[in-house]
């Protein structure tokens, strides 16, 4: 017996970009959008993307597995980013294959220790973003890490 579960939004849509898959992801998207709206610049909203959340998850896995190996990290980063094609780019988050942020950066972070204000440090970069990718990865020792990336897909 096999059961297929399709997430459905309140309005009946099954579009993966319109259905946020879990409460933790929804909380991150809501927090980022509330902080943007409440900022002195009155920054715009970003919209959840299943596709870019998958890219974000791959980036987080690469960070977890290769952050001590800069060459491998950069090579894997390039492979992951290439999947986006030429019409999208990461504008906030893991934006550079040659810069491997430490855990103290606040993004990536241990779940519950994320510093969302780091997403707004460069408001001109934030203003380019229209999609948000959110990822959580549980490691073998049970620690859950999270990463948020903002994408310009226009």
Located regions from the model:
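Short, well-ordered surface patches within globular domains
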Residues: 15-89, 130
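A well-ordered secondary-structure block
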Residues: 78-154
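C-terminal motif of bacterial Sec signal peptides marking the signal peptidase cleavage site
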Residues: 5-9
